[in-house]
A protein has these predicted regions:
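Active-site-proximal alpha-helical segments within enzyme catalytic domains
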Residues: 69-70, 176-211, 244
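Bacterial Sec-dependent N-terminal signal peptides
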Residues: 1-27
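Conserved catalytic neighborhood of penicillin-recognizing serine enzymes
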Residues: 97-136
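Short, Gly/Ser/Thr-enriched beta-strand-loop segments that form substrate-interacting elements
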Residues: 218-244
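Beta-lactamase-like hydrolase cores
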Residues: 21-65
Length: 244
């Protein structure tokens, strides 16, 4: 029987004032270390684009579907360079809609042979974590290698994106080919907020889609429910075999 493993990242997209830290960075870091002692958890915090704090940042964490956020930024870059909007249509073929994976897109359009906009596909990937929509975007926008190359051109280093959703479904070991450190993941969130990665309407679309994300509401956003914090996040959940 397959077990489930979760890889979770979440960031506060700074649309509300950052709460003043009651303790110094060193004290906060020590508190966080104690909280996650003996657990496979990595933490990274960036405040005002410069002050950083990390815990267990020297591990390559498998991203699972978290890389769909990275993909969205690469898609935005290509659209920006081409001067086209997220309204650009993409034809969806029947063989794009694999039956053996999580895909609300396939459930809604089981026959394929239709066109949806890039923005609609991004809503499926970021909002619902649709695996087929992700691989359709890879087909159109250059595959994992293009996303990896774009992020490296921006200065990201401690990460890799090499596998599609179909690759990971066929071979669980391929899940480890898409990895990141906590700091690089949070740095990418900070770049989105600041406009360094994705600009204008592209940035606004991705940010708002992540804020309205429907997956993982019972995970990291849960403790902040009812507060003034505005949470934008992308979770990832994958399978593991009996050996872990």
């Amino acid at each position: 029987m397959k077990k489930r493993i979760r890889t979770i990242w979440a960031g506060v997209l700074c649309l509300c004032p950052v709460l003043a830290l009651q303790a110094g960075w060193g004290d906060l870091q020590e508190q966080l270390r104690r909280m996650v002692a003996d657990k496979k958890v990595g933490i990274a915090v960036i405040v005002d684009g410069s002050d950083t704090l990390t815990v267990n940042n020297d591990v390559r964490y498998p991203m699972m579907s978290v890389f769909k956020f990275h993909q969205a930024l690469a898609v935005a870059d290509v659209c920006g360079q081409r001067g086209v909007s997220f309204d650009t249509l993409v034809h969806i073929r029947p063989d794009d809609l694999r039956p053996d994976t999580y895909s609300p897109l396939r459930d809604k359009y089981p026959e394929g042979n239709l066109s949806l906009s890039v923005g609609e596909l991004l809503k499926y990937t970021l909002h619902l974590s649709d695996n087929n929509a992700c691989d359709i975007l890879f087909r159109v926008f250059g595959g994992p290698a293009a996303t990896d190359e774009y992020l490296r051109s921006m200065g990201l280093r401690d990460f890799a994106i090499e596998a599609t959703e179909d690759d990971m479904h066929r071979n669980l070991a391929d899940c480890y080919r898409n990895w990141t450190t906590p700091l690089e993941a949070v740095r990418l969130l900070e770049w989105l907020v600041s406009g360094k990665a994705a600009k204008g309407a592209y940035r606004d679309f991705i940010e708002q889609t992540m804020i309205s994300c429907q997956t993982g509401r019972d995970r990291l956003p849960a403790p902040l429910a009812g507060t003034k914090a505005v949470i934008g996040h992308k979770t990832g959940t994958g399978d593991r075999n009996g050996k872990g």
